[in-house]
């Protein structure tokens, strides 16, 4: 039986691979919008992510949290966005020879699992909105993530930009709490 990972149908009405988003703030707003719509549609946790070609702003991968919808603890927004991008580009790495630099924008700082996926994905930049403590304040367990975790990414050539539009992402967490969204790993 094949393993199939799918995004909710509503994602196509928000964004699609190939669209261009020029500015970092707008790229992050897309990741945050994916998180917000995931909450509004009751299709998962309050997390969204997108992979972009750095210099063109072309979307190459989209992701939302699908842990509950797909019954898998592995299906976090960052992992989905990275898998979508790699699948579309036909490469296990986004740093293959001849490929442009790719950036991962995430509505929240990655958990331990997603940090590992980011490290091995081939992205050259990680941009986050909400901070680890924001997710933990909501009740999520982010696992063993330390300052050294991010220093390791930097040593591997991945630029890390934290807390871009943090308050906008925190508003999605507030919406999730308001709606009684489940904390599935706390």
Residue positions per predicted region:
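Short loop/turn motifs at secondary-structure junctions and domain boundaries
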Residues: 40-44
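A structural microfeature
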Residues: 60-61
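A short, polar/charged loop-to-alpha-helix boundary motif
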Residues: 66-80
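Zinc-dependent deaminase
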Residues: 1-38, 117, 121-186
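Short, solvent-exposed cationic patches
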Residues: 76-94
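Short cysteine clusters
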Residues: 111-114
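Immediate flanking context of iron-sulfur cluster ligation sites
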Residues: 95-108
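Short beta-strand scaffold segments in enzyme catalytic cores
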Residues: 47-53, 57
């Amino acid at each position: 039986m094949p393993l199939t990972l799918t995004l909710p149908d509503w994602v196509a009405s928000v964004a699609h691979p190939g669209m261009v988003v020029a500015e970092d703030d707008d790229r992050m707003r897309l990741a945050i919008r994916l998180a917000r719509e995931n909450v509004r549609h009751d299709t998962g946790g309050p997390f969204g992510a997108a992979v972009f070609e750095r210099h063109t702003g072309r979307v190459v991968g989209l992701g939302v949290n699908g842990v509950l919808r797909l019954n898998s603890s592995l299906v976090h927004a960052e992992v989905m966005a990275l898998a979508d991008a790699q699948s579309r580009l036909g490469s296990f790495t986004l740093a293959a020879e001849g490929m442009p630099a790719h950036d991962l924008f995430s509505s929240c700082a990655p958990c331990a699992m997603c940090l590992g996926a980011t490290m091995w994905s081939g992205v050259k930049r990680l941009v986050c909105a909400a901070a680890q403590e924001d997710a933990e304040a909501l009740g999520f367990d982010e696992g063993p993530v330390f300052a050294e975790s991010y220093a390791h990414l930097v040593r591997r050539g991945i630029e890390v930009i934290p807390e871009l539009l943090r308050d906008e992402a925190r508003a999605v967490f507030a919406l999730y709490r308001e709606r009684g969204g489940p904390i599935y790993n706390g």
